[in-house]
């Protein structure tokens, strides 16, 4: 089971070739993909997103947010920032969701490496 970050989803939806988009395609065919709620929010924020794509994205099972999630996400972000590493709020929410659910995160965004070092995020960083 995997979750994909927004960067991988956008590349996939635009038909961009890459290790990550191929892995996402295979995982979708095998029904081995779950959706991070923050990623879904980012994807649905695109005013140009076709309605049929929105409907398809909404059919992917979402990872459940667990109690005290917001506190853990805030502490995770603070931990990364204390090391003077980049930790965008959305990335912290995505990382914490995957950490809590023990789900591998597939991405092409190298900023997630900071969460691997700080919190043992299970990351599959693909070459675009």
Q: What does each model-identified segment do?
A:
Residues 1, 95, 99-128:
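Acidic, PIN/NYN-like endoribonuclease modules and their adjacent C-terminal/linker elements
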Residues 1-35, 44-55:
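Short, well-structured N-terminal submotif of metal-dependent ribonuclease cores
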Residues 4-7, 35-36, 86-88, 109, ...:
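Histidine- and aromatic-rich ligand-binding microenvironments
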Residues 8, 39, 69, 93-94, ...:
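Alpha-helix capping/helix-boundary segments
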Residues 12, 42-43, 72, 114-115:
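Phosphate- and divalent-cation-binding pockets in alpha/beta enzyme and binding domains
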Residues 26-28, 55-56, 80, 98, ...:
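A generic structural signal for well-ordered alpha-helical segments
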Residues 50-54, 80-81, 122-125:
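Short, hinge-like loop/turn segments at secondary-structure boundaries
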Residues 62-108:
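Active-site neighborhoods of divalent-metal-dependent phosphate/nucleic-acid chemistry enzymes
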